[in-house]
Amino acid sequence: PKPPAEAKPAAKPAAPPAAANPFEGVDVKDPIVISAATRIQASFRMHKNRMALKEKSIPKFSQVLKDMFVMEGSAVTFFARVWGIPDPVIKWFKDGQEVKQGPKHEIKFDDKDGTFLIIRNADGDDVGTYTCQATNSFGEAFDSARLALEVPAKCTKQPDNITVKAGGNFEIKVEIAGEPEPDVIWTKGKKEIDEGGRFSYEDSPDYSILRVEKAQAGDAGKYEIEIVNDLGKARAYCTVKVN
């Protein structure tokens, strides 16, 4: 018998055809090609920048504080929205001094990057500039707003009654308050006292003074002081005796 034929090695598969070069025949000096390449590079850089922003960001205010004008004795709420990566630490300040949580002040946060400063029973001591500070490891941001009170006109201290010798000088002082700053009207016997001659005034946000020189018998009597602003009015009285 014939010996078995030797097995022939399998034929190697044919090599795949070389992939076509997508840039073959492209003129890199063509203005259209240059413009397209520039746009692609710019888009890639923007994508990298966006990714970097997702990884880190200094704090930024997306909603800033607003100035507040409120009635004395009411509650005040300052609100801001601020974000950053990592999340910033928030602090509140009044005229440069940190505001701490307590019976007078409450600091709150919501789940949308919002922060609140609540001031209870606002009074004159609360007037000033409030600042929200946001800080993380990449930087800090600030925003500020003012608090002003609206206070009805009032007399904070009644004037004293006066006794003066004829020919002497005297003054009547009334202490006042109000925001907006009140006007003061002086009258005697229902007649307004005009400035000039023996009569002069000194006015400030906290007081008003009527000065009278060389007192005469006709200066004796009851003086009325009316304190007025847009929110209200008040009256004060004083009696003068001339000996």
Swiss-Prot record:
GO MF terms, alphabetically ordered: protein kinase activity
Record domain Ig-like C2-type: where: 59-150, 151-243
Domain IQ: 35-62
InterPro entries: Ig-like_dom, Ig-like_dom_sf, Ig-like_fold, Ig_I-set, Ig_sub, Ig_sub2
Biased composition (Low complexity): 7-20
Functional summary from the UniProt entry: This protein is the target of CAVP, which binds to it in a calcium-dependent manner.
UniProt xrefs under PANTHER family: IMMUNOGLOBULIN, TITIN HOMOLOG
Stated name of the protein: CAVP-target protein
Gene source species: Branchiostoma lanceolatum (Common lancelet)
